[in-house]
C-alpha cells in the first residue's frame, strides 16, 4: 500500500453539548496544560543529560589509576549521551504531529521542535547544567516523558510482544469467545477501551473486525499514540533507547543502550477491519450515555480512579443489557498516598461485592496472572504483578425481570489463582442461544467476516 493509500484514524475530544461548552471555556487552560506536556518532551534531553553529567563529573574527579580502570565505562557514558540525543530527535518528530484533532489548526512553525530548549547548546555537555523553571516544565512531567518512551516499546515493538501477550491476550481471547464471528456481525459489536494508552489493544480488537473506540486522558499518551497511529508510515522506521535512563542493575553495558525499533506494525499500512478511533477526555465525564457499548475492555485501568466505584458504575451504565466487561490488571491505586488527593483502596474481595451490588454477574475471575509492565527484559531487577482478571456481564432485561441473576457468593469463592487450575480443565460453557438473545439489539447474526489471528 502506497502512502497515498494510507488510512488515518480519528482522534478527537469526545463530548456532549454541555461538555463542549465547558471545553470552549477551558480551552485556554487546556492549551497551557498541553504546553507543559510539550515542554516536558522538549526538556527530556537536557534533564537526562543533567543526570549523566553527575556521573561524568564524578568520574573525572577520580584518581588517574581509577580512571584507567574505568576507560570502557567512560566510553559507555559517551554512548549514553548519544542515545539521549537520538531519543530527543525522535521526540521532535513526535511533537511535529502534535495536532490531535481534525478541527485544530497547526500550532506554530514545525521547526520550533528542531532545536533544543533555550540556553542549551545541542551536544555541549557543559551547557546542560541549566535551571528548570517549574512554570515551564516540571521534573515529574519529564519523568512521564521518559515513561512514554518505555510504553512505546511495550505497545509498538517486537521487544514488547511478551508483555502484550501477558496483558492483552486474555482480554482478546475472552472477547472473541463471547462474540463469535459465526454468531454476530462483528462490525456491530461496539467495544470501548478506557485508558487506551498508546492504542495497541484497541487497534488489535479493531483488526479482528469489532467497532472499537479507545479513550485516553493523558496528553503524553495522546501525543505519542497520534504519532504512531497517524504519522508512522513504515514498520520499524524509528529507533528508541527506552532503557538509557536506567543506570543500575545492568549486567552488560549494552543493556542500558539497547535499541528498540517501532512500530512493529504500521497501522497506516495495515488498517483494521473494524471501525477504530481514539477519543480524548475524562472517562467519567464523557461516557454517560446508557446502553451504548456491547463490551468494555480495561487493562491496567480501574486503579486509576480516586473512587473505583465510580468507574464500575459508569461501566455498568454504558453497557447494553447482556454486554460484558473484561478486565485485567493490578490494584495499584494511583492516588493512594498522593498529597492533596482522596482515595479508597478496596481489596479484590471488596471489588467483588461492589460489582455484584452494582448489578454485574461475575462470569469468570482469576488471580495470580503474571504480568510485567514496561520492564527492561535485560535488567537484573524484574518486577511483575500478580494481576486480576475477570469477565462480568450486565444482566439482560429478561434476567432482571425474572430474577434469574446468579445467587450471591462469598468473595473468597471468586478468588481462583491462575496457577491453581489443573491443566486441561474445562470451564463451564455459556448457553450460546442465551448469548445471542442478550445482544440481539446491537448485533446481527451470521457474520461472514473472518477473525484475524492475534500476532504472537
Curated annotation (Swiss-Prot):
Outcome after substituting residue 30 to A: Disrupts association with the GATOR2 complex but not S-adenosyl-L-methionine binding. Constitutively inhibits mTORC1signaling
UniProt-annotated binding residues for carnosine: 303, 334, 385
Record note on disruption phenotype: Viable. Egg chambers develop normally in adult females fed a full diet but show enhanced degradation and apoptosis under methionine starvation. No effect on larvae fed a full diet however larval fat body cells fail to inhibit mTORC1signaling upon methionine starvation.
Note: The name 'unmet expectations' refers to the loss-of-function phenotype of female germline cells, which fail to sense and adapt to low-methionine (un-Met) conditions leading to their degradation.
Protein name stated in the entry: Carnosine N-methyltransferase unmet
Residues that bind S-adenosyl-L-methionine: 154, 195, 216, 282-283, 299
Assembly with partners or alone: Associates with the GATOR2 complex; the interaction is probably direct and is inhibited by S-adenosyl-L-methionine binding. Associates with the GATOR1 complex; the interaction is probably indirect and mediated by the GATOR2 complex.
An example Gene Ontology biological process: cellular response to amino acid starvation
Modified residues (Phosphoserine): 408, 420
Origin superkingdom: Eukaryota
Native source organism of the sequence: Drosophila melanogaster
GO cellular component: cytosol; nucleus
Catalysed reaction equations from the record: carnosine + S-adenosyl-L-methionine = anserine + S-adenosyl-L-homocysteine + H(+)
Gene designation: unmet
InterPro entries: CARME (IPR012901), SAM-dependent_MTases_sf (IPR029063)
EC category name: transferase
Compositionally biased residues, Basic and acidic residues: 402-418, 427-438
The family this protein is said to belong to: Belongs to the carnosine N-methyltransferase family.
Stretches for region Disordered: 402-456
Function, in words: S-adenosyl-L-methionine-binding protein that acts as a sensor to signal methionine availability to the mTORC1 signaling pathway. Associates with the GATOR2 complex in the absence of methionine to inhibit mTORC1 signaling, but dissociates in the presence of the methionine derivative S-adenosyl-L-methionine; S-adenosyl-L-homocysteine binding does not induce dissociation. Required for mTORC1 pathway response to methionine starvation. Exerts a protective function on developing egg chambers by inhibiting mTORC1 signaling under starvation conditions.
